[in-house]
Curated annotation (Swiss-Prot):
GO cellular component, one term: cytosolic large ribosomal subunit
InterPro entries (UniProt xref): Ribosomal_bL33, Ribosomal_bL33_CS, Ribosomal_bL33_sf, Ribosomal_zn-bd
Biological process terms in GO annotation: translation
GO molecular function annotations of the record: structural constituent of ribosome
Lineage: Bacteria, Bacillati, Actinomycetota, Actinomycetes, Mycobacteriales
Membrane keyword on record: no
Protein name as catalogued: Large ribosomal subunit protein bL33A
Organism: Mycolicibacterium gilvum (strain PYR-GCK) (Mycobacterium gilvum (strain PYR-GCK))
Pfam families: Ribosomal_L33
Primary gene name: rpmG1
Length: 54
């Protein structure tokens, strides 16, 4: 297995509808479903949920 198969690069898109994204890696073995992280969105200047975008 290559490195990219185990820990692929994923985009996290803001649920506030601003279009702001973060880019991160995820471990498929620990998180087989889509990731949801609470991070800062500078467009709306507050913390919002960011969901994995495929």
């Amino acid at each position: 297995m290559t490195r990219n198969e185990i820990r692929p690069i994923v985009k996290l898109r803001s649920t506030a509808g601003t279009g702001y994204t973060y880019v991160t890696r995820k471990n498929r073995r620990n998180d087989p479903d889509r990731i949801v992280l609470r991070k800062y969105d500078p467009v709306v200047r507050r913390h919002v949920d960011f969901r994995e975008d495929r």
